[in-house]
């Protein structure tokens, strides 16, 4: 009985630490959040051309309500028109125990101009799947998003 009491006392003492540790981001998720933030910054500064550079050779973009665009097809697309911008913020990331695959998701804002020159703002959510490459770098293998109402 005494051993059982000691076991419960030890468990009660370490339980808060175990719960706290489970709620902390892992180094893997921290890395993916940083990669995603670097990706977003590059696109904010350099547009569509920067977007493509973060994709693996076999990476694809699953378009909102549309088809699948390969990296090669992305490279052929024209640069964004003046006044077009894409910004996003990762909300969560997680990495596989193997340490070579992970995902991020978050919210995006896409701004463009219509034919009349008026600014059109599209809000949405995205998911990026990241894969560690043979050279040790990380690249996006799948990127997808869907539009959603303006956040409140």
Please state what every model-predicted region is.
Residues 22-53, 58-152:
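A beta-strand edge to alpha-helix "cap/lid" segment located at domain peripheries
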Residues 7-17:
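Bacterial N-terminal signal peptides
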Residues 1-4:
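Positively charged n-region of N-terminal signal peptides that target proteins for export
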